[in-house]
Amino acid sequence: SAFGFAGQKCSAASRAYVDESLFDEFVERLVARTEAIPGTSPLEPGGFLSPVINSAAVARYTAAVSDARLTGRVLTGGERLTDGHHERGHYVAPTVAIVPDDSTLWTSELFVPLLTVRPVATLDDAIERANAVPYGLTAGLFADDDADIGRFHARIESGVVYVNRAAGATTGAWPGVQPFGGWKRSGTAGKAGGGPYYLQQYL
């Protein structure tokens, strides 16, 4: 869910907090999967990689990548794509980066295909970091412990929450069909739930 639509989706994943005991293996697999994304045109069968919308988005991407390189590490991606069919659009490579805690990449909405990753010691640490941003539209968790899942649901400041959704960790709701709205600067604390009459339309 980080790189579909070139990250230009309001629910695209932009941050991943990973249990420190799994971090190295997770990053290795993430980088391998990212580098295996087909570079074919989105108009062709099997095409996945879309262009960003305009030159301003390319500039946002370029600035974010430069910041990641200056303060942290770009693990894969980080380039403008201009070969073949990429020459006629604003194509940029899906990017994975490790950046310090004070980087603005943790707290900015970029709408480009860039995912930051960080190890955490505990679920509570991950929740606190996830909540320490001005946005709260979607969040996702992969866990097998019911108590951890319950704690995440209770504490995460996000309007839409997914658990163990392999097809997209932070995306998948159908706006207009399912409740879809956010907290903080992503909405107004849950009004997208539909109010007192929302549930009745399903009865």
Name each model-derived stretch.
Residues 1, 34, 38, 50, ...:
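Conserved C-terminal structural/oligomerization subdomain of aldehyde/semialdehyde dehydrogenase
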Residues 1-101, 124, 128, 163:
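ALDH superfamily catalytic-core signature
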